[in-house]
Each structure stands twice: as C-alpha cells, then as structure tokens.
Curated annotation (Swiss-Prot):
Can convert prostaglandin E2 to prostaglandin F2-alpha. Substrate binds at residues 24, 117. Its main location: cytoplasm. It comes from Oryctolagus cuniculus (Rabbit). Changing residue 306 to F: Greatly reduced 3alpha-HSD activity toward DHT; little effect on 20alpha-HSD activity. This is Prostaglandin-E(2) 9-reductase.
C-alpha cells in the first residue's frame, strides 16, 4: 500500500488517513483559493480533507472534491472528509440541521467525520460569534451531553460515518465518556498540537481511552491578528527545528509533521501554496530517530497560538485546566 495513504483505526471501526489537508484561511483570502488548494492536495495524494462550517468554504471545498471524483482521480470512498458543528448550533434540535446545511453546501451525501468544533455554546443565530453592545460574546447554556446525543443521532442517520470532538480538555471528554446511556464515544479529539504545545498529557489520556488525537496548527498556526498574538514565536523559525531540517535534508514543516506522526497523532497540514502542499506529503519518506524526537520534545513550553479569547469566561472554556 502506498505509504501516502496510511490510515489508523478509529474506535467505531472506520479508518482515518494519518495525514490530513487543512482548509482554514483568514477572512481576506478568497474562498476560491480553498477550492484550488484542495484540488492540488488531492492530486498530490492527500485523501483526508478537514473543513468546518466556521471556515465558510464548504461550497468551494465540496466543489473541489466532486471535481476530483468526476475526473476519475478519486472515488468518494477514497476521501475522508471532516466537518465541524459550530458553537451557535449546540442546542440538540440544531445539530442535525447544521450538518444537513454543510452537506447541502458540499453537495455530498455524508461526511466521514463530524466533530463538535468547540465545547462552548454560543447564542443561536446567523452570526458566527454573536456579541452584546460591549462586543462580548453572548454565551448559551447547553448540556454538552445533550449535544453529543444529537451527534449520535447524526451517525445513526448515516449523515456522518464517525463523530468526535475538538478543543475538549480531559474533564470535558470524561463528561461524555461517563454519560449514562452513551452510544458512541468520540473517535477523536482535534486540538492545537505542535512542538511548543505537545499535549503530552492529553495525548496519553486520549490513547488510554481509544480516542485518536488530531493535531491542528501543527506547523505553528497562521498569524491572523484576530486570533493569534502577533508577538507569538514563529515555530518554523525555531533554530532546533532548523538544525534537524538541515540534518535530514527536509523542510522545517516536514520535521514538525513527522514528529506528530511518530507520536501516533493524526496531523493536519495547512498550506495553499502548491510547492508546499506537494512537499508536505513527503512526510512519509523519512524517519526521525528517537534522539531527534527527544530534542523536539524539549521544545514544549505549553504555548498556545489559538486561545479562543471569545469564549473566555464561558463555564466550558477548555483551556483553563492543565489539560
């Protein structure tokens, strides 16, 4: 089997490709770029495509996937597509309609994975982040377990093959895992994860529960001022990662991606540049010896790029706990 298509088993029997293509881009990037980049990614060998309602690009990403099916490059079953339930749709009666909305935009019959994007419910409505007159996000009170039951129904209805979560801490995962009458446990927890925030404890916990950790911002994150502190260190400019890149004759990005794969993490690589998209899939062509893995481990400083400040103060804000 082509190493590019390496997959790992999820707890429900489905398989997820270990390397995924991330499609998020800042607001000012034209949505058409997501379509072009997704086509390039599929041509390069990516089979796992990650998007979300929040990214507002599912029409374009769906178009890219369908055009690659139409031209014979892939079949629908070759593609593993992830979408995410946004915070304004946590009320149980809104979960399925939100997924159906994504499917309509995608023009697909099902998603391979549907995940709760963030554990904090926001006031339902058309605004992505509803705010009061002081510019503060308006929270909603929804039991996360009730949202999860609605997710389970989406799986039973065949609209999502697998269901999972994102940005959950240990306590929030345990709330679902210990829920009376739990039908399906989350197959994954998609979180920010890179050498500066290596999530060692959360990874260990997830592995112990058969939950796959999926890494976003694996290359250190975009620099969008609304979401990321502009003084944040640039991961790919780290001298230790640079030295390892030189040693292995790879790019710093490939070192950061390879590090995650060797820890048993499913990793998302985000780039809209053709050259880099094609480079990133070369992550299967080399290995890091354990001493290099230890060097990268030593870079951990629990530094988070995506702090989701809009949700600070919400009872379910996930990043106040240690992990």
């Amino acid at each position: 089997m082509d190493p590019k298509f390496q997959r790992v088993a999820l707890s429900d029997g489905h398989f997820i490709p270990v390397l995924g293509f991330g499609t998020y881009a800042p607001e000012e990037v034209p949505k058409s770029k997501a379509m072009e980049a997704t086509k390039i990614a599929i041509d390069a060998g990516f089979r796992h495509i990650d998007s979300a309602y929040f990214y507002k690009n599912e029409k374009e990403v769906g178009l890219a996937i369908r055009s690659k099916i139409a031209d014979g490059t892939v079949k629908r079953e070759d593609i593993f597509y992830t979408s995410k339930l946004w915070c304004t749709f946590h009320r149980p009666e809104l979960v399925r309609p939100s997924l159906e909305d994504s499917l309509k935009n995608l023009q697909l019959d099902y998603v391979d994975l549907y995940i709760i994007h963030f554990p904090t419910a926001l006031k339902p409505g058309v605004e992505i982040i509803p705010t009061d007159e002081h510019g503060k996000a308006i929270f909603d009170t929804v039991d996360i377990c009730a949202t999860w039951e609605a997710m389970e129904k989406c799986k039973d209805a065949g609209l999502a093959k697998s269901i999972g979560v994102s940005n959950f801490n240990r306590r929030q995962l345990e709330m679902i895992l210990n829920k009376p009458g739990l039908k399906y446990k989350p197959v994954c927890n998609q979180v920010e994860c890179h050498p500066y925030l290596n999530q060692g404890k959360l990874l260990e916990f997830c592995k112990s529960k058969g939950i796959v950790l999926v890494a976003y911002s694996a290359l250190g994150s975009h620099r969008e001022p609304e979401w990321v502190d502009q003084s944040a260190p640039v991961l790919l400019e780290d001298p230790l990662i640079g030295a390892l890149a030189k040693k292995h004759q790879q790019t710093p990005a490939l070192i950061a991606l390879r590090y995650q794969l060797q820890r048993g993490i499913v990793v998302l690589a985000k780039s809209f540049t053709e050259k880099r998209i094609k480079e990133n899939i070369q992550v299967f062509e080399f290995q890091l010896p354990s001493e290099d893995m230890k060097v990268i481990d030593s870079l951990n400083r629990n530094f988070r790029y995506v702090t989701a400040d809009f949700a600070i103060g919400h009872p379910n804000y996930p990043f106040s706990d240690e992990y």
